[in-house]
Swiss-Prot record:
It is found in: Membrane. HPO-19 and T05H4.4 are cytochrome b5 reductases required for PUFA desaturation in Caenorhabditis elegans. HPO-19 knockdown or mutation alters FAT-4 desaturase activity. This is Delta(5) fatty acid desaturase fat-4. The chain crosses the membrane at residues 137-157, 257-277, 292-312, 319-339. One of its GO terms (molecular function) is acyl-CoA (8-3)-desaturase activity. It is a multi-pass membrane protein. It catalyses: (11Z,14Z)-eicosadienoyl-CoA + 2 Fe(II)-[cytochrome b5] + O2 + 2 H(+) = (5Z,11Z,14Z)-eicosatrienoyl-CoA + 2 Fe(III)-[cytochrome b5] + 2 H2O; (11Z,14Z,17Z)-eicosatrienoyl-CoA + 2 Fe(II)-[cytochrome b5] + O2 + 2 H(+) = (5Z,11Z,14Z,17Z)-eicosatetraenoyl-CoA + 2 Fe(III)-[cytochrome b5] + 2 H2O; (8Z,11Z,14Z,17Z)-eicosatetraenoyl-CoA + 2 Fe(II)-[cytochrome b5] + O2 + 2 H(+) = (5Z,8Z,11Z,14Z,17Z)-eicosapentaenoyl-CoA + 2 Fe(III)-[cytochrome b5] + 2 H2O; (8Z,11Z,14Z)-eicosatrienoyl-CoA + 2 Fe(II)-[cytochrome b5] + O2 + 2 H(+) = (5Z,8Z,11Z,14Z)-eicosatetraenoyl-CoA + 2 Fe(III)-[cytochrome b5] + 2 H2O. Belongs to the fatty acid desaturase type 1 family. It is an enzyme of class 1 (oxidoreductase). Pfam families: FA_desaturase (PF00487). Keywords: Fatty acid biosynthesis, Fatty acid metabolism, Lipid biosynthesis, Lipid metabolism, Membrane, Oxidoreductase, Transmembrane, Transmembrane helix. Its main location: membrane. The lineage of its organism: Eukaryota, Metazoa, Ecdysozoa, Nematoda, Chromadorea. Disruption phenotype: The fat-4 mutants lack detectable Delta(5)-unsaturated fatty acids.
Length: 447
């Protein structure tokens, strides 16, 4: 959950061949928050239809918006940059697909999207999600049982497992994967997210929808912005003087990256508290209107979570339990969510990759090899390519759509990246090492 500052100036987006103006009133009322800003002055046709599958409210909103479309095509400024070779192009991919071929890929993906929907793969199974919720609740209750019988370390580890599995559930409900009525998905996300997990549903959406809309696009995807601790692209180094202590961190980031993974949950807990505390005055109407639900849910989470610590025998046990449960949960989450995108190239906004949604998702995502245990442990995110192409598709259908996605990629000459964990993790480390080498090169100039 890496939240970024947003610009709120009016802009245009193109949907179904029409340029629609997004003014302050429209932007504030957007239920998806900042995700709409990622396609500022761009064609958002495919991403709109992909993100809003089955949403009557979204299409009613679009119909009203199209009534106000300007009759003349607006002037859209070109996006240009001047990268320095050997520095700004490190870890950066290129998008060299012609407009004609890009249009063919877009049409092919639309056909795939229609086929997937016709085959019922966008429909969630209530029984599946009831089972997954009960699994996590029973895991927590068993951890309570172990704690009661003084098996404190196993109890803490089991709580960490529960934290991770709850992470997948808030992710799925925040993506509206089960209910067609999005209000019910929101309620479910408050329960598994705010109350059980301690993560803000709204904070998750605000960050994660932006990430999905502009995956690995520099300046758009907030997940790439890990400064001052890590730099995923050389552009991030420009924010610091060459003799800064931050540059020293960057020089060795590939070494200490692994050691920071367990702290992800603690970071997200803190960011959730900050986000929820600011919701009553948030720019977007949706977050202001749902602030009370999230505040109550998060307050109840910390009430029972701190109550669990209270019943431990002494402070040393409490500290051990807190750290073990949250660090285990943090590592189990982070070793998944960092694998899929940090191990692949990033793209400049000027690369034009955002003009083709399918290419964007396939070229910026790596799958983990599937298996029954991995499917459970990773919450289906080992099928990350499929998930990014169809974010509202329920977890239990991702393995079914995988052959269709492979077929689509092969037919359109697109890569389909899938590796075992250690191969993907090493590629992730290499990406951080590449930027570390750039930081070392820059700091040597002043030595």
């Amino acid at each position: 959950m890496v939240l970024r500052e947003q610009e709120h100036e009016p802009f245009f987006i193109k949907i179904d061949g029409k340029w629609c103006q997004i003014d302050d009133a429209v932007l504030r009322s957007h239920p998806g928050g900042s995700a709409i800003t990622t396609y500022k002055n761009m064609d958002a046709t495919t991403v709109f239809h992909t993100f809003h599958t089955g949403s009557k409210e979204a299409y009613q909103w679009l119909t009203e918006l199209k009534k106000e479309c300007p009759t003349q095509e607006p002037e859209i400024p070109d996006i240009k940059d001047d990268p320095i070779k050997g520095i700004d192009d490190v870890n950066m991919g290129t998008f060299n697909i012609s407009e004609k071929r890009s249009a063919q890929i877009n049409k092919s993906f639309t056909d795939l999207r229609m086929r997937v929907r016709a085959e019922g793969l966008m429909d969630g199974s209530p029984l599946f999600y009831i089972r997954k919720i009960l699994e996590t609740i029973f895991t927590i209750l068993f951890a309570f049982y172990l704690q009661y019988h003084t098996y404190y370390l196993p109890s803490a580890i089991l709580m960490g497992v529960a934290w991770q599995q709850l992470g997948w559930l808030i992710h799925e409900f925040a993506h509206h994967q089960l209910f067609k009525n999005r209000y019910y998905n929101d309620l479910a996300s408050y329960f598994v997210g705010n109350f059980l997990q301690g993560f803000s549903s709204g904070g998750w959406k605000e960050q994660h929808n932006v990430h999905h809309a502009a995956t690995n696009v520099v300046g758009r995807d907030g997940d790439l912005d890990l400064v001052p601790f890590y730099a995923t692209v050389a552009e991030h180094l420009n924010n610091y003087s060459q003799d800064s202590w931050v540059m020293t961190l960057f020089r060795w980031q590939h070494v200490h990256w692994t050691f920071m993974l367990p702290f992800l949950r603690l970071s997200w807990l803190l960011q959730s508290i900050i986000f929820v505390s600011q919701m009553p005055t948030h720019y977007y109407d949706y977050y202001r209107n749902t602030a009370i639900y999230e505040q109550v849910g998060l307050s109840l989470h910390w009430a029972w979570s701190l109550g669990q610590l209270y019943f431990l025998p002494d402070w040393s046990t409490r500290i051990m339990f807190f750290l073990v449960s949250h660090l285990v949960g943090g590592f189990l989450l982070s070793h998944v969510v960092t694998f899929n995108h940090y191990s692949v190239e990033k793209f400049a906004l000027s690369s034009n990759i955002m003009s083709n949604y399918a290419c964007l998702q396939i070229m910026t995502t790596r799958n983990m090899r599937p298996g029954r245990f991995i499917d459970w442990l990773w919450g289906g995110l080992n099928y990350q390519i499929e998930h990014h192409l169809f974010p509202t598709m329920p977890r239990h259908n991702l393995n079914t759509v995988m052959p269709l996605v492979k077929e689509f990629a092969a037919a359109n000459g697109l890569p389909y990246m899938v590796d075992d964990y250690f191969t993907g993790f090493w590629l992730e480390i290499e990406q951080f090492r590449n930027i570390a080498n750039v930081a070392a090169k820059l700091t040597k100039k002043i030595a």
